[in-house]
């Protein structure tokens, strides 16, 4: 077996499949593009769903890739096992309706065992297969596998929701009896027992059925085009090839671990307790790549995953004695390890380091808050005479504050308490099951549409024509190809079209289809790309249409031009965001509609009013400079040399369109644009908001809509000016400042009146002093408009020696507010209000001298007041 570096293993995989006619698909962003079903790209095939479900027919049906992926269903296992990771690389080879079982198995065996390639010893390889899949069993024997190395497994059938499915055959490497201390042997494989002897290195899925959850597996229909979908974990392959005990002892992780050794002063013990080293090495890889791809730590979705990973890694750093931000220092090491295939980490190093360090510092503050929360739990339990911290509280400390259970157990032990481990595990399991359910739900592929897949006639889009004559080459009605159609809805394909199919965030053209006499025979209501790339016109049929006849295609030119203005403005906006916010503010999604444009971009905080003003100003300046908009067609490499901005994760063909706007913007884009920025007229941002962790959204309008937006603002200002009796709009700020000053004065006077009224009322309330067990107390219901007035009563009470304790209750709206104030150490206001609050179906708490509670059961107010004496 050859000794290879991880970079060599990856490259050898890609090179081998290239010799078999496969196109090398580059690794795409971990953040899915145009796929809301996925939180992360979680497999090599996830980026190819559009090919497998038949939405798009690839230029080459043979594809290979090395795809970075993230899975976070079982984060807690990372570091505990030899091969569990959050981020990993999946090597794959795929056939979209081309070769099938025989070639897939033959070539897999060749790649693994040929001296020219990996040169694995054949006797070390074992294969599992689906019992009913005799064809795979026979093929393995034909290529030279000993039948005793073929193990039938009932679970070897791949399906995930609706869509492509089929039997799979897995390849395992036998590391020998040294990794099988109980000498169980092949039962480890046959009974699917977790083990370190037989390492799964490759799974070949023979995708031949359309899975349908509504019917039994035996009734699944055959796919019109059978596919091959395979996945080999790079980390596992490298561990086997490099003879490493675990994946972490390979050149993918050890450089990171060595850096952690330097930072901690601790030594990584391969056979000892090394979990913290593994967790840190794994998690910083995920963080570096995910942040580099535009995801940012936050409180939901992808952001929550990253925040959790960072906090877990940070806590393990503390276990190694690292008590300051350190993860950001590991980013360059991650970048250097992966540089040969993933240069983006080093290219974005400064930004990634900045985000990681900021999040580490934030976590340090959160951890401090968590310690206060934990101490509060301990104090409450002591008050109640209890000694077990509830599993729900342990989970909250873990989930909200990043506290590992061990830290909570230490706090509990110091207080002479224990932790409800079972309750915590139950809460953890519930969360993991939710995550798994979500992952399964989002993983399915759509059903293949055989009719559209089989339409292979050529069709071209004419960018320059708003109207042209073209032959009708395909008609689809009721999901079948027909020769003519006379009514209803149909889908049409023409040899040439002037209609833009929805793509790249630009909406489709609308318009009409006319016959030779000029009669409108159909209205076009939508245009989408068919699987083989043709423009598929959805039409309402008004008169008979027949195949191979010439028709005139006329788009709605006014609609197209309005969309073009918004699309070109989007390019200007993208450039302005880079200039003002930074190069990290890249496109995360866009929509160029008729009346507006919507642009999503990565940014780690809300855009300030000053920044928005500067962005809007810069875009308008470029509009008024009347910059020429040019489009050229070239190959992708030339386009990148020109400096064209490519959207990370987007798939580009060999030939691309480059759109330049003066020397201000240059992007790869397949959409339609104005010829000169002056055609846009005006640009106005109408809204900026966050739509998820690390993602912001700008809504803007151009041209007539921008003018109308400004006019609406002007009309509103004029209305305000009239209300304020300001002769001119420019005097409105001065008038408003005057009103604000008047309001402040009135509020001050009102507060003074309230204090006087409270003092007057207090005179009567404070006279009603009772005594029990040597404690003087006042317990009374008062009539006030807000809870703040209760505090005013308490402030007045503190001024004189009326009593030791004050309890005030007020019905405000449909709620009940309670205030407890104490002047003696013997009476703890916070504890007392906690005991009283349940009477009114409420909760509360506070300090020893002042506490408040809120509830909803107003009929129980008197019962609460009567209960005070019994609590003293």
UniProtKB/Swiss-Prot annotation:
GO molecular function: alanine-tRNA ligase activity; aminoacyl-tRNA deacylase activity; ATP binding; catalytic activity, acting on a protein; transferase activity; tRNA binding; zinc ion binding
Record note on cofactor: Binds 1 zinc ion per subunit.
Pfam families per the UniProt record, alphabetical: DHHA1 (PF02272), tRNA-synt_2c (PF01411), tRNA_SAD (PF07973)
Key word Cytoplasm present: yes
Required co-factors: Zn(2+)
Catalytic activity: tRNA(Ala) + L-alanine + ATP = L-alanyl-tRNA(Ala) + AMP + diphosphate
CDD domains linked: AlaRS_core
Top-rank taxon: Bacteria
SUPFAM superfamilies according to UniProt: Class II aaRS and biotin synthetases (SSF55681), Putative anticodon-binding domain of alanyl-tRNA synthetase (AlaRS) (SSF101353), ThrRS/AlaRS common domain (SSF55186), Translation proteins (SSF50447)
Top EC category: ligase
EC number: 6.1.1.7
Swiss-Prot/TrEMBL domain comment: Consists of three domains; the N-terminal catalytic domain, the editing domain and the C-terminal C-Ala domain. The editing domain removes incorrectly charged amino acids, while the C-Ala domain, along with tRNA(Ala), serves as a bridge to cooperatively bring together the editing and aminoacylation centers thus stimulating deacylation of misacylated tRNAs.
Function: Catalyzes the attachment of alanine to tRNA(Ala) in a two-step reaction: alanine is first activated by ATP to form Ala-AMP and then transferred to the acceptor end of tRNA(Ala). Also edits incorrectly charged Ser-tRNA(Ala) and Gly-tRNA(Ala) via its editing domain.
Protein name: Alanine--tRNA ligase
Encoding gene (name): alaS
């Amino acid at each position: 077996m050859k000794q290879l570096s991880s970079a060599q293993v990856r490259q050898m995989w890609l090179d081998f499949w290239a010799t078999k006619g496969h196109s090398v698909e580059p690794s795409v962003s971990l953040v899915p593009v145009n796929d809301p079903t996925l939180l992360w790209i979680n497999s090599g095939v996830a980026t190819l769903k559009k090919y497998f479900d038949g939405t798009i027919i690839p230029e080459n049906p043979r594809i290979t890739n090395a795809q970075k992926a993230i899975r976070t269903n079982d984060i807690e296992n990372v570091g505990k096992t030899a091969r569990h990771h959050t981020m990993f690389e999946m090597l794959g080879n795929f056939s979209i309706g081309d070769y099938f079982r025989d070639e897939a198995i033959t070539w897999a065996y060749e790649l693994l065992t040929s001296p020219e390639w990996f040169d694995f010893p054949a006797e070390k390889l074992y294969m599992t297969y689906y019992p009913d899949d005799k064809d795979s069993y026979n093929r393995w024997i034909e290529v030279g596998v000993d039948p005793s190395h073929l193990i039938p497994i009932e679970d070897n059938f791949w399906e995930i929701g609706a869509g492509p499915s089929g039997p799979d055959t897995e390849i395992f490497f036998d590391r020998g009896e040294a990794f099988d201390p109980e000498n169980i042997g092949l039962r480890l494989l046959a009974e699917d027992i977790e083990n370190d002897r037989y390492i799964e290195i490759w799974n070949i899925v023979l995708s031949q059925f359309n899975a349908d959850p509504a019917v039994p597996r035996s009734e699944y229909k055959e796919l019109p085009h059978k596919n091959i979908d395979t996945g080999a974990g790079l980390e596992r392959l490298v561990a086997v090839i490099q003879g490493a005990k675990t994946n972490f002892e390979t050149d993918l992780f050890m450089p990171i671990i060595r850096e952690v050794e330097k930072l901690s002063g601790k030594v990584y013990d391969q056979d000892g307790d090394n979990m913290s080293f593994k967790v840190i090495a794994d998690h910083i890889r995920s963080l570096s790549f995910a942040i580099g791809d535009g995801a940012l730590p936050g409180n939901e979705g992808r952001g929550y995953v990253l925040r959790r990973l960072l906090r877990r890694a940070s806590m393990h750093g503390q276990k190694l004695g690292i008590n300051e931000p350190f993860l950001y220092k590991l980013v360059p090491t991650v970048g250097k390890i992966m540089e040969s295939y993933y240069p983006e980490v080093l290219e974005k190093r400064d930004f990634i380091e900045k985000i990681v360090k900021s999040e580490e510092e934030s976590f340090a503050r959160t951890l401090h808050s968590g310690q206060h929360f934990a101490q509060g739990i301990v104090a409450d339990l002591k008050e109640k005479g209890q000694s077990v911290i509830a599993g729900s509280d342990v989970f909250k400390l873990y989930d909200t504050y990043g506290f590992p259970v061990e830290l909570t157990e230490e706090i509990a032990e110091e207080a002479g308490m224990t932790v409800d481990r079972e309750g915590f595990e139950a809460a953890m399991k519930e969360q993991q099951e939710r995550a798994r359910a979500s992952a399964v739900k989002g993983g399915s592929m759509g059903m293949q549409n055989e009719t559209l897949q089989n339409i292979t006639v050529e069709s071209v889009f004419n960018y320059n024509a708003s109207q042209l004559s073209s032959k009708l080459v395909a008609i689809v009605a009721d999901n079948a190809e027909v020769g003519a159609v006379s009514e209803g809805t149909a889908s049409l394909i023409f040899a040439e079209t002037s209609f833009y199919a929805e793509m790249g965030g630009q909406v489709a053209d609308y318009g009409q289809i006319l016959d030779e006499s000029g009669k409108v025979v159909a209205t076009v209501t939508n245009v989408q790309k068919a699987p083989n790339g043709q423009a598929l016109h959805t039409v309402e049929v008004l008169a008979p249409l027949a195949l191979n006849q010439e028709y005139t295609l006329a788009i709605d030119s006014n609609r197209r031009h309005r969309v073009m203005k918004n699309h070109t403005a989007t390019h200007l906006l993208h450039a302005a965001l880079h200039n003002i916010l930074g190069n990290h503010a890249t496109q995360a999604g866009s929509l160029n509609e008729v009346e507006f444009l919507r642009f999503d971009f990565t940014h780690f905080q809300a855009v300030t009013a000053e920044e928005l003003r500067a962005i809007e100003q810069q875009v308008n300046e470029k509009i008024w400079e009347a910059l020429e908009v040019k489009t050229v067609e070239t190959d992708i490499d030339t386009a990148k040399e020109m400096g064209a901005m490519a959207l990370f994760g987007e798939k580009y063909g060999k030939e691309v369109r480059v759109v330049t706007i003066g020397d201000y913007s240059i992007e790869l884009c397949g959409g339609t644009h104005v010829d000169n920025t002056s055609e846009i007229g005006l640009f106005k941002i109408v809204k900026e908001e966050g739509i998820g962790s690390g993602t912001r959204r700008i809504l803007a309008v151009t041209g007539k809509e921008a003018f109308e937006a400004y006019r609406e603002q002007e009309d509103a200002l004029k209305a305000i000016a009239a209300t304020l009796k300001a002769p001119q709009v420019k005097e409105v700020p001065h008038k408003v400042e005057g009103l604000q000053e008047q309001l402040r004065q009135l509020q001050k006077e009102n507060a003074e009146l309230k204090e006087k009224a409270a003092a007057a009322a207090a005179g009567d309330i404070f006279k009603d002093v009772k005594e029990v067990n040597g404690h003087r107390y006042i317990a009374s219901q008062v009539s006030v408009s807000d809870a703040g007035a209760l505090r005013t009563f308490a402030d007045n009470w503190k001024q004189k020696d009326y009593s030791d304790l004050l309890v005030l209750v007020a019905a405000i709206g449909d709620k009940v507010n309670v205030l407890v104030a104490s002047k003696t150490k013997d009476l703890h206001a916070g504890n007392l209000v906690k005991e009283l609050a349940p009477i009114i179906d409420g909760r509360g708490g506070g300090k020893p001298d002042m506490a408040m509670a809120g509830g909803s059961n107003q009929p129980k107010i008197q019962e609460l007041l009567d209960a005070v004496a019994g609590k003293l």
